[in-house]
């Protein structure tokens, strides 16, 4: 099979094509299965199997049964994670922390009904902010709207009380604020489940105790950039938009990013993984559906504006594609956004009216080549496999070699990556 035939199969799954343009042999069906496996699209791929079966393009029975069994497992797993996200959000909010589910389960509602529970899920990523920070931002927003100087929020405005170990019989509490409150809260959760192991902490998240075997990453920063200037802009932008995301509740019992924030956040997520271990088509499919939902909000917003109204979530203005691109360019991702548009067009046959910018064919071909070689998060990339799976030094050299491939395309982010990695090692030693 040619590469385009695999893409046509995915286009059938997402509803952009009725059938395939080539005859599919039994061997080809097995190739399609392996392709979906590499890209973590088994569940979505089975939807294409069902649609093709309805038009007379039949998958071998044994493979179809195997495929269906895996799709059912994915559906049950999604139901479980949705329930766990709801429970986690309720517990954290009871304890004084606002939450917003990112990535995996945060993307499910963007998918159409027939695909929603067939998205292959992994762990739970939750963006967490103490209530005090949210209230402070609202104060500042009200001040800005009234043309006053920003109201400053002191620690007296609130905090999160964390039980600490003192060696005494009575429990003592210390009040923490901001990022420190999130970190100490998660550490307390580890103590409550009897874990003496220090949780792994990184610049943007800390690993919380598992929920019935499901890994949980608690983000005090939703994402980051290697360049100090771009990272400063990114952190400021997401801080300004945190409150509306925390309040964007769904019928599932947890909040997700608003459509406008998500179309920015998901691009940052893609860019980060492009520099890290690699990207897969599952992440690109997430962005495909995020774009469609955002575009529908923009169209609805235009209708409301004609009536003198605008809204998203709780009254937050919907970002136009020009505004989205202005934000992404300020993060150094303008060229990458064009590459993503190219991949979405080639793989999913996305309509041009969903574009946030013109496709960049040159960078898009590079991105698509990386995706096809590496599979989901680069797990199937055989280039320099010995270095990748070696010790700390070998892995560091592998990562440097990978980043150097991107220097010509994204020089600022690529050249800052080794510097950030060294700095981050020191940061983890100080904060771990």
Name the predicted role of every residue range.
Residues 141, 300-305:
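Intrinsically disordered, low-complexity linker and terminal tail regions
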Residues 146-147:
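Residue-level signal for mature regions of secreted extracellular proteins and peptides
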Residues 1-122, 128-133, 151-152, 157, ...:
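Conserved NTP-donor binding/palm subdomain of two-metal-ion nucleotidyltransferases/polymerases, i.e.
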């Amino acid at each position: 099979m040619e590469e385009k035939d695999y893409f046509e199969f995915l286009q059938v799954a997402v509803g952009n094509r009725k059938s395939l343009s080539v005859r599919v042999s039994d061997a080809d069906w097995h190739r399609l299965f392996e392709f979906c496996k590499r890209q973590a699209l088994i569940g979505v791929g089975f939807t294409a199997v069902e649609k093709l079966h309805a038009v007379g393009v039949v998958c071998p029975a044994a493979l179809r049964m195997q495929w269906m069994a895996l799709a059912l497992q994915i559906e049950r797993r999604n139901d479980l994670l949705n329930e766990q996200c709801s429970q986690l959000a309720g517990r954290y909010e009871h304890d004084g922390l606002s939450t917003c589910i990112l990535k995996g389960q945060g993307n499910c509602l963007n998918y159409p009904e027939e695909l929603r529970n067939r998205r292959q899920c992994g762990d739970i990523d939750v963006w967490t902010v103490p209530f005090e920070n949210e209230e402070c931002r609202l104060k500042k927003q009200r001040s800005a709207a009234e043309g006053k100087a920003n109201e400053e929020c002191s620690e007296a405005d609130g905090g999160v009380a964390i039980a600490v170990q003192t060696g005494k019989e009575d429990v003592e509490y210390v009040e923490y604020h901001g990022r420190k409150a999130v970190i100490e809260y998660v550490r307390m959760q580890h103590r409550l489940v009897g874990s003496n192991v220090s949780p792994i902490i990184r610049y943007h998240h800390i690993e919380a105790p598992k929920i019935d075997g499901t890994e949980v990453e608690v983000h005090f920063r939703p994402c980051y950039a290697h360049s100090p200037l771009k990272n400063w802009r990114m952190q400021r932008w997401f801080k300004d938009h945190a409150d509306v995301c925390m309040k964007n509740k769904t019928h599932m019992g947890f909040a997700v990013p608003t459509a406008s924030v998500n179309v920015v956040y998901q691009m940052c997520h893609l860019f980060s993984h492009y520099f890290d271990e690699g990207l897969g088509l599952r992440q690109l499919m997430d962005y495909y559906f995020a774009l469609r939902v955002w575009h529908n909000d923009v169209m609805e917003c235009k209708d409301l504006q004609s009536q003198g109204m605008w809204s998203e979530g709780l009254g937050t203005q919907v970002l136009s594609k020009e505004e989205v691109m202005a934000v992404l360019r300020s993060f150094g991702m303008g060229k990458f956004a064009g590459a993503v548009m190219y991949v979405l067009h080639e793989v999913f046959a996305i309509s041009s009216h969903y574009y946030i910018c013109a496709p960049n064919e040159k960078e898009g071909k590079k991105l698509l080549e990386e995706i096809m070689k590496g599979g989901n998060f680069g797990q199937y990339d055989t280039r320099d496999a010995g270095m990748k799976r070696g010790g700390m030094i070998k892995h560091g050299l592998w990562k440097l070699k990978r980043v150097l491939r991107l220097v010509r395309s994204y020089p600022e982010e690529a050249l800052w990556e080794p510097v950030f990695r060294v700095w981050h090692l020191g940061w983890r030693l100080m904060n771990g």
